[in-house]
Amino acid sequence: MPQRGHPSQERLWALPSLPMAHGPGSEVEGLLDLSFLTEEEQEAISDVLKRDAHLRQLEEGRVSKLRASLEDPWQLKILTGDWFQEARSQRHHHAHFGSDLVRASIRRKKSPKGDQALGSDGEAEAAGEDTIEGEPESRVSIEVAAPERSTETQGPDLSSPYVPSKASEGQEEEPQDHECELEAPGEGGVQVAEADPELDPEQKAEQESQPTPAQSKATSKILENGEEAPGLGPSLDRMLSSSSSVSSLNSSTLSGSLMSLSGEEAGTVQVRGSVLFSLHYEPGTSELRVQVIQCQGLAAARRRRSDPYVKSYLLPDKQSKRKTSVKKRNLNPIFNETLRHSVQQADLPGRVLSLSVWHRESLGRNIFLGEVEVPLDTWNWDSEATWLPLQPRVPPSPDELPSRGLLSLSLKYVPAGSEGGGQPQSGELHFWVKEAQSLVPLRPGSLDTYIQCSVLPDDSRASRQRTRVVRRSLSPVFNHTMVYDGFGPADLRQACAELSLWDHGALASRQLGGTRLSLGTGSSYGLQVPWMDSTPEEKQLWQTLLERPCEWVDGLLPLRTNLVPRA
């Protein structure tokens, strides 16, 4: 952004006290001159405006609930903030907000033809000076109703539909997180879209089909705290979609980093080049420090140039994204930046460092330039900086997906009448769930976990058993025994015992992984079923159980993340 001393920027700092006339002849005079802003600065302002509108919507929902639940006028006046509005109206005679003025000024900063011309380097260039006369769409009047604290920007009807965009989260600035990255088809390449999981895995696909203005009015939005608030309404729709300057900054792309989420072409870039980096673990702060030094011989993404940056993940944690800055027009960029990942030293052997290089597109989807994956269990920590060649991205097969840790358990089958006196009356299957080891959380921090057991094909809720919840532990000790009866030796050959690990949440639980114990024949009682998919290690444990009745059989099995859905 420009320095504080810039005269136009000084006007931005004085927004709350800026006089603004409401007469038709003075609408333009009250607006700000934002012609000096660069494209990146426009994007930053757009993010702030969207965040401001979102926070106002949350505040309106809070106030409406207070008005419906409180009867004391004095307490209601304090909690809703009406006292502040009265004090503000006595000091400031205007009713508009500074954000409304900036939004209206961005509307005015619009090319005469309403679009942008592409320069030789593929980026947008200014299409001309701002014009006021002869452009009715650039004139705007701002009316604010202070008691309701709602804003409305009045303007002409727009032909382009409103495209909602999620307010940016996190503190990373370059590159912008609302953009999407796609791998260009190249050598062994497939398309890969980058989506921001900030969204935490509990956050779901960030954007789906884009609604029209009429749909936006009728559709309620889900608040961050899980509650529903009224739809954004037409005034907010117009504020965010009232000009090409703002709507062009909205991103309707889906973000997500490790899977292909779009079928659009992103160019034809063949992966080549290499990356120089070094790794160091700091025990005092429990940090893995990845020093990204430089890249060399990168592919040109646009007209013999690339704007590269490096992104890192500490897999399988998809929330551990870190990024370097963007180096403009450089196929041999020098970064010399350190990316820090918080991780316990004992967890390093189960992690894989992913370093990927991307070309940043200002107006479109970022382009994949290559990646390297470094298994930390085999890394030489005494080595100096290392050059590794960039590789094309290949989607992993289900068998190659990592596990979430290990499950220690013991099994025992007690045939009917084997204990004397006709006991037990039917065959019993015993599970002793001891502990889970080296669990990998979905996001940094500990887990609240439990183990759930089902003996398929009986998947009824009544037949499920589970352990207690062990809180805040990545190596939880359960020491829990479960018993199922009614099984004969022939039944065990058709059955499959599924033990799954779950992350317990206040509203819902999430399955992290599991193991399936069976003979892995693919069929049960003559029917083909997908859940008979046991690995060789799981098959061996189940076969040993059948061969050694009345004995405890111990096993230490990986908690697989690639369990095939039952149905």
Curated annotation (Swiss-Prot):
Residues covered by the C2 domain: 271-390, 403-532
Domain (RabBD): give its ranges: 31-87
PROSITE patterns registered for this protein in UniProt: C2, RABBD
The biological process GO terms on file are:
exocytosis; intracellular protein transport; vesicle-mediated transport
The biased composition feature labelled Polar residues covers: 208-219
Please describe what this protein does: Binds phosphatidylinositol 3,4,5-trisphosphate. May play a role in vesicle trafficking. Acts as a RAB27A effector protein and may play a role in cytotoxic granule exocytosis in lymphocytes.
> Protein name, please?
Synaptotagmin-like protein 1
Protein species of origin: Mus musculus (Mouse)
